[in-house]
Amino acid sequence: MNVPRLPSLLGVFAHPDDESLLAGGVLAQHHAAGARTAVVTATWGPDSRRTPELTDSLHALGAGAARLLGYNDARNPEAAPGQPQLVDAPLDEAVGRLVAHIRAFRPDIVVGHDAVGQLTGHPDHVRTHQITLLAVEAAGLAHLYPEAGPPWQPSALYAATHPESGVGLLGPLLEGVGKSVLAVRDSYVTTSVDVTPWADMKWAAILAHRGEVARERSLPGILARLPEADRDRIIRTEHFTRLTPEPAKGDPVQQGRVSKIDRGL
């Protein structure tokens, strides 16, 4: 069986567990195809209780060591004591930190959060989306953040997202524990990836976040308590919107969802 060559991939997510929940399948897929993969996490510090779990999750996905921006979580002050919350941190500073990671790793593709903050609209998700948009553009401009290393321009930026038609079983479960459910129109999705062959790796990465799995109101906790068949239906497809470069007129991605079952991002 020939494994298609896939581009290098850098995930940028707000919290430990976002990487496995939102893009664990494509990270595992790209790694299995021999591509370089890595993840930058915006909140929680190196000495926090969740960083060892993040390390285990990244190991399960083949995504290397944890790379941290080091900011505090908007809803959990123990994430990075003494550090500003991500939502309060100077935007220029946060962008500069991410630019340094992009230039150091030199990814072909960056994938991060969408503009609505995924299903729950977490403010850290929204802020990470804003930081990622700016950092991907700035990383390719030599006159910006010269201290962050030689410029590097990723070829594309994708946002992990949830289309209205894909919320299905998950929506009522989140509403049942008092969480918001925010989805985008199906037409906003440009790529849907069937990650079934890598679902076991993705699930192992989710389970690595042991503290979240133990919390019944968290998404990992909700998934862990579902029948296996229902859980598999939720985690085996990942949806993305290509943000840059914008689809050209007449590009197939403008016509709605493009399935890349074997090609990843």
Regions picked out by a protein language model, each given a short descriptive name:
Residues 1-8, 81-82, 89-265:
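Metal-dependent de-N-acetylase/amidase catalytic core
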Residues 1-106, 137-138, 239-244, 249-250:
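Active-site rim/loop-helix segments in enzyme catalytic domains that contact anionic ligands
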